[in-house]
Curated annotation (Swiss-Prot):
Function field: Catalyzes the deamination of adenosine to inosine at the wobble position 34 of tRNA(Arg2).
Cofactor: Zn(2+)
Official protein name in the record: tRNA-specific adenosine deaminase
Subunit structure: Homodimer.
UniProt cross-references to Pfam families, sorted A to Z: MafB19-deam
Native organism: Staphylococcus aureus (strain Mu50 / ATCC 700699)
């Protein structure tokens, strides 16, 4: 659990980078053998790419580092429960373990809305550990959206 807290802290640092860019503050870290091999934060608005989620970018970077699309032996740390797209990418990249901070009751596909990561009819499943630094991860998101709503009201 100590390593999980450390790596989630790094994911939170990535999420803060996203917030500074006006992106939804979500950050991701991928480790292998307790070493960080990839890090990323949301860039969807910056790149105007619907797939530029933190998890998706981190997975692409990790695959490049390892020279393989199979990310066996890796752990993905992400500040928000993965969405359907990211959960699919996790399954397809064979990541065996996912650790996330905040639940996403409206779009989470790692147990909240549905659980694609442990779907028995897929040929790969991931262990999911949730709630690591949940409060810090949740606060980043709620603060971001509160400020976004306040800014929209002040411009109207």
């Amino acid at each position: 659990m100590t390593n999980d807290i450390y790596f989630m802290t790094l994911a939170i640092e990535e999420a803060k980078k996203a917030a500074q860019l006006g992106e939804v503050p979500i950050g991701a870290i991928i480790t292998k053998d307790d070493e960080v091999i990839a890090r990323a934060h949301n860039l969807r608005e910056t790149l105007q790419q619907p797939t530029a989620h933190a998890e998706h970018i981190a997975i692409e970077r990790a695959a490049k580092v390892l020279g393989s699309w199979r990310l066996e032996g890796c752990t993905l740390y992400v500040t928000l429960e993965p969405c359907v797209m990211c959960a699919g990418t996790i399954v397809m990249s064979r990541i065996p373990r996912v650790v996330y901070g905040a639940d996403d009751p409206k779009g989470g596909c790692s147990g909240s809305l549905m659980n694609l990561l442990q779907q028995s009819n897929f040929n790969h499943r991931a262990i999911v550990d949730k709630g690591v630094l949940k409060e810090a991860c949740s606060t980043l998101l709620t603060t971001f959206f509160k400020n976004l709503r306040a800014n929209k009201k002040s411009t109207n």
